């Protein structure tokens, strides 16, 4: 063999180069998704411990009348959606096990989503300029929030960010629809004819079990987040809203101290009405025309992780401006 040491060194260098390229390529793929072009640092995208679709989305939802929804108690929480003149309730005890429901309201495609780690329930119009998108659960998380994926392009979408963070549709936004994270009794009082997502999901799940109970009681998070704040307890609940790219949050602690069930707040010189229901732990925001705006009830840590620039409603300051 001629110049065998040189050949060996060349071969070793080639092997190391291939291994490095393979490692880089592997690092750019998470749970089968290419994140090499992600809008967020890839080291902040975590695997949640389940394969893609290991948490199965519901694609053929079945509903029952309120009279037949005996599996719901007054204080059970639901995601309530009133859209195109139709009211539907999605019990949290079902959403915890599926996180995504691809549904239709009078023919219009929407996707209802829930992230148990962030307490965030959001609904999206999935029939926009990108065509009809249907979603699944990627098994990945960013800031502890579920990363959805659309089955048409396999782009990854951040629920709270309302944006595709990687893939063909990277940077695209998805339009949220007002969603009430409230009790069944409160939702039914406003929408007595609301149908309810039934246990007949096509999957065998124990919908009465709350597997997140220990997590909800704990102060700990499952994964690191990009921004932290100790201003409020991590898992204290807040109402978060984005208006013309400006974010504001209404901590339930501040709403309790404020004491008013209905009051007007001003954002960018425009008045908005806040409705606060302490008994049902529910809040919503309406514009000057009385239209409900998309918002999200979410844990403080999650809202701040995505929106460190957020304005924060303070009860004491609001009292001084009355």
Question: Can you say where each PLM-predicted feature lies in the sequence?
Answer:
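Bacterial N-terminal signal peptides
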Residues: 11-19
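Short linear, low-complexity motifs centered on an aromatic residue
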Residues: 6, 22-25
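Mid-to-C-terminal functional-domain signal that highlights helix-capping/loop sites
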Residues: 24-322
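Bacterial N-terminal signal peptides that target proteins for export
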Residues: 2-11
């Amino acid at each position: 063999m001629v110049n065998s040491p040189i050949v060996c060194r060349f071969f070793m260098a080639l092997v190391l180069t291939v291994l490095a390229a393979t490692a880089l390529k592997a690092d750019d793929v998470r749970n089968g998704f290419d994140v090499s072009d992600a809008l967020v640092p890839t080291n902040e995208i975590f695997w949640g411990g389940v394969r893609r679709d290991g948490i199965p989305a519901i694609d053929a939802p079945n509903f029952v009348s309120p009279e037949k929804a005996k599996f719901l108690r007054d204080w059970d929480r639901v995601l309530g959606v009133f859209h195109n003149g139709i009211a539907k309730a999605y019990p949290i005890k079902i959403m915890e096990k599926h996180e995504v429901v691809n549904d239709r309201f009078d023919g219009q495609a929407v996707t209802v989503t829930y992230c148990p780690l962030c307490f965030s329930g959001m609904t999206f119009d999935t029939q926009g300029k990108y065509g009809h998108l249907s979603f699944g659960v990627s098994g990945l998380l960013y800031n502890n929030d579920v990363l959805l994926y659309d089955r048409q392009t396999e782009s990854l979408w951040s629920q709270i960010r309302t944006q595709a963070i990687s893939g063909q549709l990277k940077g695209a936004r998805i339009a949220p629809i007002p969603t009430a994270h409230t009790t069944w009794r409160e939702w039914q009082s406003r929408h007595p004819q609301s149908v309810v997502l039934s246990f007949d999901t096509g999957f065998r799940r124990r919908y009465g079990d709350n597997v997140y109970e220990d997590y909800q009681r704990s102060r700990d998070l499952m994964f690191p987040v990009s921004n932290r704040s100790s201003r409020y307890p991590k898992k204290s609940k807040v109402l978060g809203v984005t208006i013309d790219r400006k974010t504001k949050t209404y901590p339930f602690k501040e709403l309790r101290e404020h004491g008013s069930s209905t009051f007007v707040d001003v954002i960018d010189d425009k008045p908005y009405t806040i409705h606060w229901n302490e008994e049902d732990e529910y809040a919503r925001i309406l514009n000057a025309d009385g239209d409900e705006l998309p918002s999200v009830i979410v844990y403080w840590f999650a809202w701040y992780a995505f929106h460190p620039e957020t304005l924060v409603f303070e009860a004491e300051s609001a009292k001084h401006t009355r």
